[in-house]
Amino acid sequence: ATGCMTYDFFFPGLLLDAFEHQSFEYLLFWINEILTQKLKVVNMLGCHDGIPLLDLKGLLPEERIMEMVEILKKRGGLVKDLHGVQSMYYQVNCTYFSALGESDRKMLLARALQIFMPGKPQVWYLDLFAGKNDIDAVKKANSNGHKEINRTNLTTDQAISSLQTDIVQDQLALLRFRNTCPAFSWDSNIQVQSTASHQLTLTWSYQSHSA
């Protein structure tokens, strides 16, 4: 429907590709597409359904997609094939933190890029807590329980303990900044600069405010 926001299912995979290849080439193309087409999107890193890959066809070369599938499998991700056909990948069930090699630095950078991406950021709770792949939950589930890898039920004690970690506090600081800085407005002007494939600058401006 006209005027409705849509989920940006491209961003998670394009960002992972950018990190692996140290190049923002394909992500930059998509950012410019969002801006020129005036798309209204909700962006995310991980979600309850894993990391979508089928959506990347046409944006990423097939070999880059398959390379990413293999990388995430080595990091504990479980591949969901379309209609059960192994050659027809659909999504990788994996926490975003594990997809990033469980690197605090990459997780924080991913969150920073997310809040500066065009659109409205949505946060999956397990990403915020830097959750790792929950293999035990998958084993306890039925044959279709692959999604449980990214749906850990945190206890109150686990949540409180995680809140004390730097990676969680740093993400919360970024989210507070996104929610309170006047530069991030629905009517903001977003400028994109990239002087080299490994460099990307996103600037939001609204009235006298910029970020």
Name what the model sees in each region.
Residues 1-211:
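Active-site and adjacent substrate-binding regions of carbohydrate-active enzymes
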